[in-house]
Amino acid sequence: MDFNNYIGLESDDRLNAFMATLSVTNRTPEYYVNWEKVERETRKFELELNTLNYLIGKEDIYSEALELFTNQPELLKAIPSLIASRDTSLDILNIDENDDMSFEQLNFLVIDENCIADYVDFINQAGLLDFLQNKAKRSLVDYVYGVEAGLDSNARKTRSGTTMEGILERTVSKIAQGKGLDWKPQATASFIKSQWDIEVPVDKSKRRFDAAVYSRALNKVWLIETNYYGGGGSKLKAVAGEFTELSQFVKTSKDNVEFVWVTDGQGWKFSRLPLAEAFGHIDNVFNLTMLKEGFLSDLFEKEI
C-alpha cells in the first residue's frame, strides 16, 4: 500500500493497515549494552577496586576488611558498584534475632569515618565479604565490568525510545535536505515561534517535539512525535490519549500546523481500542514499515 491509498482510507481501515505492518522489533545491535557507559562507570573506581583485590581469599576477612577500611575509608565508595547499586546513600532495614526492626542510613559518597564498623557490618550482611573470601577468583575490576553490563540492561527501555528518535531524525534529515525543508530535533513551541514565526498551541509548557519540519514555501510546520512499545500495558492507553489530545491542541493554531505520530511495536496489539480512538482524530499515524516506504516524504511532497 502506498501513502495516497493509506491516507485516503477511513480510520478503521487505516488502523487495520497499520496493525498489519507492525514491526517485530526496533532493537538494533547497539540496543543490548552501552559499552561506553559500562566502561565509564567501571573506571570511576578502578583504583579502589584494585586495592580491594587485597581482600580476595582472606581467612579472617571481617578483621582484614575493618582494618583496610579504617586505614583507607575512601575505598568504601566502590562498594555500591560491587553490590549492583546505583545509589550512593542506602537506607537499610535491620531485623535482629528477636525480630526487632531498626533503620539506618549509610552514605557511600561522604564516608562517616566514625561508623566504619557499621559499613563493614552491612558489607558482611549483604554477602559481599563471603563472596570476596570464597567465590571471587580474579580482578574485581573485571567483576564490576560484568555488574555494570547487567545494570545497563535497565536502560534498554530508554534506548528503545532513543532508537526511534534516531531513526526519525535520520529519515527527516534526508527528506529535508532533498526537499529544501528546515527541521529541528527536540523542537519547542518557543523555538518554532522565534525561528519560523509559527504559533504552536501545546498541552505542556515544556513540550518538546521529537522533530519539527518547516516549509518556507508553504509557511507550514509538521510536528512529529515518535515512540515504540514492544509490550502491552496501561501506558499505551495513556499515550494514545495524550497524543489524541495533543493533536487537537495543534489543530487550534491560527497558523498552518500539522501533527504526525510515528509509532510501532507489538504492544499495540494489546491496546487496539485506545489506538483506534486516536486514529479517529489523528490522520497521520505511521509505523516503521511506512517510514521505510516513504510515507513521511510523500506527506511533505503532497503539499510542496
Curated annotation (Swiss-Prot):
GO terms for biological process: DNA restriction-modification system. InterPro entries: Restrct_endonuc_II_DpnII, Restrct_endonuc_II_DpnII-like. Keywords: Endonuclease, Hydrolase, Nuclease, Plasmid, Restriction system. It catalyses: Endonucleolytic cleavage of DNA to give specific double-stranded fragments with terminal 5'-phosphates. The keyword Cell inner membrane does not apply. It comes from the Bacteria. It holds the Pfam family DpnII. Its EC number is 3.1.21.4. One of its GO terms (molecular function) is DNA binding. Belongs to the DpnII type II restriction endonuclease family. The LlaDCHI restriction system has two different methylases. This is Type II restriction enzyme LlaDCHI. The gene is llaDCHIR.
